[in-house]
Amino acid sequence: MLQFSFQNCKTHTCYMNTSVNEHLDQDESFLRILIDTRKKIRSSYFKPQTFDEFVHCLARVRAMKRLVSICSNFDEEDNWNGVWNTLVVDGDSHASAMIDYEGLLDKCSLSRNLLELINDYAEYTTQVLPFRKIPSSDNLDSSLNLTVASPKSNLYYRYSSESPKYAKILDCPDEILQLIFSYCYDASYIEKLPFAFSYRKQRHTLIHDLPNTCLRFKKILSPRNVSFWKRLLKVHKKNPNSAVTCSESINTSAVAKFTDIPTIIPIFLDPSYQSYAAKTIHSDTSSLASSIIQTGDGTQSCDESTYIELACNLVGRCVLCNRIPKLTKFKDCITSFYRPSVATNICDQCLEAIIDFYEPVSRYKFDVMKDRLGVGYISRPGQKFPSWLSEHVQLARDEEKAFKSIYHSQGEFARSLFRLFRAQLAELCEQ
């Protein structure tokens, strides 16, 4: 049993409590859209209707199994085994009699653990998967924060005696996306070409509100990143109609201190990403240029290859930084750009910045993160504190690799399995 310590970050605890309470119910309509979208994603995951959906399911299963195989928290395992072995070796019959080992394990382990559920789905059974109950932690005392290792799966779950709530595999509550938007959406950014010169002169919530651990994202917009600014300056000189120049003064008073969470993202919320992929990947550079930027009169399009390269390869279009996906030779590159668990497009660099923000949050306020996420935490070997978002990134990368492998190398075999899956599903519906 572990006792989590938050002594290193007491100064941030009050800030996190206030911020979480501020943004939970900020936009009900946006939250409703996300809930509906994620319902569609979950239904398509458990009952894929097309071959592409089926391949995505297989890729997700393979990624989950790989993640489970490499995830084992050695610190917790050693501590738990140490407590167990101490009692056994010492032969303290009185202490052993006071602890109900069997009852303690029954409360913390699944009747069928997560790995067995994944194996069931990997065998293409059509039964509804039973989900474990995850207790509420609203009034959970810190002394009851137990982390116990399941002897079969090396996964670690949180337990309390409070009233349970239900959670599903790969199920992340919608509040997490609202927090992501609230903390990482930069309200002061106005889309201009080039955005860099105005960006460097203003104070921005995205950069300044992130902890010092956010190194990757800071390096991109750092004044010391000379090559980055040279590329943008080159683009700026080739586009004289740009409204902002390096010497212009910026009216910071006109910048809104706060704007609502952006809700105009219908194309990013579409679980079937094929329509968006067709519009971006299969379009030629001329149409891409005209869709990216237009000059002041609105009639001539920019055909500068430098800017196209910048817009396509620098960050990519996402709901946070508003750039388009990278154009690669793989048509399914959009699958890693679209994040199924949060039902929206987030580029790798913004997601890394989000992770850099949430990892320290989970360390100094574990109860809040556990309550908001509602899922068991797992961590890699050598990672002392568990965090959900880092595993989400690893899962997305593994899923992308698995999708390419299945689709290109095992296509015929996957099609045979899909026919078998549909046949079993039809038999189940007839019953």
UniProtKB/Swiss-Prot annotation:
Induction is noted as: Expression is induced during oxidative stress.
Main localization is cytoplasm
| A GO BP annotation | ubiquitin-dependent protein catabolic process
The family database entries (InterPro entries) matched by this protein are listed as:
F-box_dom (IPR001810)
Summarize the subunit comment: Component of the E3 ubiquitin ligase Skp1-Cullin-1-F-box (SCF) complex. Interacts with skp1, cul1 and erg9.
| Role description | Expression is induced during oxidative stress. Plays an essential, SCF-independent, role in the stress response to hydrogen peroxide for survival, by negatively regulating ergosterol synthesis via direct binding to the squalene synthase erg9.
What protein name does the entry list?
A: F-box protein pof14
